Regions:
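Acidic/His- and Gly-rich active-site-bordering loop/insert found
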Residues: 2-97, 101-126
Length: 126
C-alpha cells in the first residue's frame, strides 16, 4: 500500500496537466462538454465508477463497502464571460477567472489519492 503522499506524488503531474488543459479551454455553464470528458477520462483511468447527472455533470462515488457516513464533495466545471482575458475563448469570451479548473484538480487529486493509496480500505461509508 502506498501512502497518500506517495500516491499524490505519482498522480500530480497528470492532474496538473489536466487542470492546465481545462484552463486553456474554458467553457460556459451547461456547455462544459470537453471539461466533462477530461474528468471522465481521469475517473475511468482510475477505475472510479461514475454516472451522468444534470446536463454536463458527473457523480462519482468511492465506496468503502462498509456502513458509515456519506461525505459529499462538489466541484464546478464552468468558466465565466471575461472580455480581454488572454485565455478567453474566442466564441464565448469564457475564461477560468473563477478558479473552477483548480477546484476540479483538487477534487481529482483527492479521489485518485484515496483510490491509489489504498486508504479506502481503512475508511467506512462513501
Amino acid at each position: 500500500m502506498k501512502s497518500v503522499h506517495e500516491a499524490l506524488d505519482q498522480i500530480l503531474p497528470e492532474i496538473i496537466a489536466m487542470s492546465e488543459d481545462i484552463y486553456c479551454h474554458p467553457e460556459l455553464g451547461f456547455k462544459e462538454f470537453r471539461t466533462r470528458k477530461k474528468a471522465i477520462e481521469a475517473l475511468d483511468k482510475a477505475g472510479i465508477p461514475h454516472e451522468d447527472v444534470a446536463y454536463t455533470g458527473i457523480r462519482a462515488v468511492l465506496d468503502s463497502g462498509k456502513p458509515g457516513p456519506n461525505i459529499g464533495l462538489i466541484t464546478e466545471f464552468d468558466a465565466v464571460p471575461t472580455f480581454g482575458h488572454p485565455y478567453a475563448s474566442e466564441d464565448s469570451c469564457a475564461a477560468h477567472t473563477c478558479g473552477h479548473y483548480g477546484q476540479l484538480g483538487v477534487m481529482m487529486s483527492l479521489f485518485l489519492a484515496i483510490r491509489e493509496s489504498g486508504m479506502l480500505k481503512d475508511l467506512c461509508g462513501k
